[in-house]
Amino acid sequence: MMRDREKQPRRKARGKDEASAEEGKKGILGSRAGKAAAGLTAAAVAAYGVYLLGSARTRRRPVTELPNALNLRLDYVPWQDFHYAYYSRKGRGRPLVFLHSINAVASAHEMRPLVRRFQRESERPILALEWLGFGHSDRPEVEYTPELLEDQLEHWLTEVVQPRGGVDVIGLSLGATYAAELARRRPDLIHSLVAVEPVGLGEDPTEIPRIWSRLLFTLPGVQRAFYDRLTTPEALYRFSRDELFTPEFGVPEEYVQYGAETARVEGASRPLDDFLSGRLFPEEAREAFLRMRQPLQVVYGTVAERRMESFTSLSELEGRPNVEVVPLPTGALPHWERPGEVYERVGDFLERAEKGAVAPA
């Protein structure tokens, strides 16, 4: 139900001490880290010009102007000093939870193709969380960490969803990785996990020095301007074309449009520093999946030029009684390129998991 947007006592998120944080974390930009780092300074200089000139296209908007991404009921939950948002539809059976990824323009809209399929063809309760800092949720000036977002997920499942016997989760990228860690710590909350293009099953990440993010955001307005430059419709289209979707499929217009919309919300650039520096990527992401005992399905695209992970660690999961691996000839968003096939494979897996046909590890 709708919660009053009143301030609640703040609970400090779990995290490492500052001394440990200063050592830096491993960033998950894979083998592309060097190429990305090489262009950051030039992009920052160009972006600063955007900030100085200003533009109606980069005008900041309140989150209330962001369109409803899923055509579902949208509610807000007070937590710590903030409020986060989630979508929901009532139904029968075990709740089905969708978790979007973490990136420069992330929101629940990323899960739209699968959500629409389950809306039409299933009677199950459907819920989709929007992480703090993204979508309709508050975008505060805080340090964004895996621990903060895992705590948010735990709070939502415990206090709002309140599942009996756990929920079935469909998570994208880091959304799946956070769910895997929570499934290990709180097996009572998560019955099964479908991980679409999960983070943590590839090669060891290349470290991105923290100095890059500090250099970028020294001048006033550079963080916002750099973000604005990266999230114009034209820039999002080029990135999606070159990095996410296969040429045969192309780039969905709605994917670009909604990404540009959410990027214009006030505070949208605040998680960017933590994302680029690698602080949002769990150090033990691989272990989170290896330690899972619940039914786990991994869905990923096999077109190497259009994915963010190498998935070299999948061999350690394959063959386990609780794991099913589904490779598809797509880019980094298989549920966009082949929504019908992904729906069928996911639906079949969840049905078998419900019947106990997928054995726990």
Each predicted region: which residue ranges?
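Conserved loop-alpha-helix segment in the C-terminal half of the alpha/beta-hydrolase fold
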Residues: R291-T330
